[in-house]
Design a protein with these regions (language model features):
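A well-structured
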Residues: 1-215
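A short, hydrophobic C-terminal helix/tail in secreted or cell-surface proteins
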Residues: 216-221
Length: 221
């Protein structure tokens, strides 16, 4: 049976020379910035100046960009080897962290969608430049928004619910080696390779992909 060698990606563009101390420091900095941003909650007013409003938007953008970089790193590191307990644990930790950050910033999102009156909304959108369409879209979602506590629960459940199940599914199915007969020849492949065949232009190849003869766990060296 063919052995599949795991490759390793260079993720230095996301986090250079990553180690626990560096990641912890980055997460702490993001959390600190988010906590600082939270302090504006009580002072938010629909009559806010366009300049200050735009600055707040860029503050959120900066926080989410930094959080997304670490999230992307964790996700790609996990995809590199879904059988790694270390990578799985790290992704879970970072995903939960990202959810916590979203919950800290949620008040601003709901304030913009629900509490800002139409006249002030038009005024602020007009001076928002590239972010104007984003702000208009947010306003369209107002009627679907829940209370802040309810929205926070949904964000948390996204991490511990469906996302956790998908991760478990990936961990199980990516461990298998599939034996498939294609063009009269038996081939062994992993789930990603099998998925490619499922999307083949040839009907017989697609049929073979979903009718694999059996699957086994790979033999450890």
């Amino acid at each position: 049976m063919v052995r599949h060698e795991l490759g390793k990606w260079n993720l230095n563009e996301l986090i250079k020379n990553p180690n626990r101390a560096i990641v912890d420091k980055k997460l702490a900095n993001i959390e600190s910035t988010a906590k600082k941003f939270e302090k504006i909650k009580k002072s938010l007013n629909p009559n806010i100046s366009s300049k200050k409003f735009l600055r707040l938007l860029h503050d959120i953008e900066n926080i989410m960009e930094k959080s997304s970089l670490i999230g992307g790193y964790a996700s790609l590191r996990y995809s590199e080897n879904t059988q790694s307990d270390e990578a799985t644990s790290f992704l879970t930790r970072v995903t939960k962290f990202g959810s916590d950050i979203e919950n800290r910033l949620l008040f601003f999102d709901l304030w913009w969608k629900i509490q800002v009156d139409e006249n002030n909304a038009r005024r602020l959108i007009k001076s928002a430049g590239q972010l104007s369409e984003y702000l208009r879209f947010k306003r369209l979602l107002a009627k679907y928004s829940l209370s802040e506590p309810e929205e926070k629960i949904i964000n948390t459940l996204d991490v511990t619910g469906a996302t956790a199940l998908v991760k478990l599914y990936d961990k199980i199915t990516n461990a298998y080696i599939y034996v498939v007969t294609v063009d009269g020849k038996k081939r062994t492949m992993n789930r990603e390779q099998l998925t490619t065949l499922v999307r083949s232009k040839k009907a017989k190849t697609r049929e073979a992909a979903v009718s694999y003869t059996h699957l086994t766990l790979p033999t450890k060296a």
